Regions:
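N-terminal secretory signal peptides that target proteins for export/translocation
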Residues: 1-15
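Short intrinsically disordered, low-complexity coil segments enriched in acidic
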Residues: 2-3, 26-29, 271-274
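Bacterial N-terminal signal peptides
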Residues: 19-31
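Active-site beta-strand->loop->alpha-helix modules in alpha/beta enzyme cores, enriched
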Residues: 35-190, 283
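The feature marks non-catalytic terminal segments
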Residues: 187-285
Length: 285
């Protein structure tokens, strides 16, 4: 009865019989009921969408996608570019159509391993920015149009993408982060999805913290996963053999197993309306 007494005392309910009647309501109000419901959730009704720039970017959250696929959720991966500029020492291919075709095959392989549906757009890396600003803007708007259609078709419950840092400050990553945010902000949703940005805590980045780090106060979602999920994610990453060598993937898998979780920053919906910037309630109070 210790729990009952401590709860009742905290709300100044000293009659034991009355406390027993009110306790169920207290559990609802304090979120215990929600937690119990979450344990019994039917994940088959859940759609989780990852939106990325390149084939292989999904590896950044691979264990998370593997986790929810294992639970029965539908995973949808959306990849904007064909990866034609992803030249490495792992193949003899130069930038261009042949490399793009190989990377499309690799991306399909990874999606199959993760148990995900795949929408692979065919935009050029950098959205043809080297060819001029006007063409870049045209390509950027085409992606927005296409994402509106894809997201409207799937109506995802959750969307995961890069944060404004792009993970590695990559131009394409940052463009996709901004593009996904724009679609979520502008679309008239039947049910607005929860948007999450991948993030890395500052202590994990050393001297790179200023360019890629996210303060822990913003990384409020700590998503855990199992060793089984790591195994699936590593197998999916091995599909991208033109980009990652086996030793690198093994090192990632070891890090994932040791850490056991990833951090995400939620895109927070407005909490109030105001007619003055200084009158808007601070989210940090």
């Amino acid at each position: 009865m210790t729990i009952k007494i401590s709860i009742c005392t905290s709300v100044k309910i000293f009659n034991n019989n009355l406390c027993l009647l009110i306790l169920p309501l207290l559990f609802v109000l304090t979120g215990f009921n929600s937690l119990l419901q979450a344990q019994d959730r039917n994940y088959e009704d859940v759609i989780i969408m990852g939106v990325y720039a390149h084939p292989d970017d999904e590896t950044s959250s691979g264990p998370v996608f593997a986790k929810y696929a294992r639970k029965g959720a539908q995973i949808v991966l959306v990849v904007a570019t064909d990866g034609r500029l992803g030249v490495t020492d792992l193949t003899d291919l130069e930038a261009g159509d042949e490399l793009a075709e190989l990377r499309r095959e690799e991306m399909q392989c990874a999606a199959d391993v993760l148990g995900a549906d795949l929408h692979h757009m065919r935009y050029h890396d950098q959205l043809r920015a080297p060819e001029g600003q006007d063409l870049f803007i045209q390509e950027s708007r085409k992606i927005i149009d296409e994402l509106h259609e894809i997201m409207g078709e799937w109506q995802p419950n959750v969307i995961i993408t890069w944060g404004p840092d792009g993970g590695s400050n990559h131009l394409d990553h940052r463009i996709i982060s901004a593009t996904v945010t724009q679609v979520v902000l502008s679309k008239d949703w039947e049910q607005r999805p929860s948007l999450f940005y991948s993030g890395t805590q500052i202590p994990d980045l050393g001297e790179l913290w200023k360019y890629r780090g996210v303060h822990e106060d913003f990384l409020t979602v700590r998503e855990s996963f199992s060793e089984e999920d790591v195994d699936v994610a590593a197998e999916a990453a091995r599909c991208h053999s033109s980009q990652f060598g086996p030793d690198l993937i093994d090192s990632w898998a070891e890090q994932w197993r040791h850490r056991g979780h990833f951090y995400f920053r939620p895109f927070e919906a407005p909490r109030a309306k105001a007619d003055d910037l200084l009158n808007y309630p601070s989210q940090y109070e």
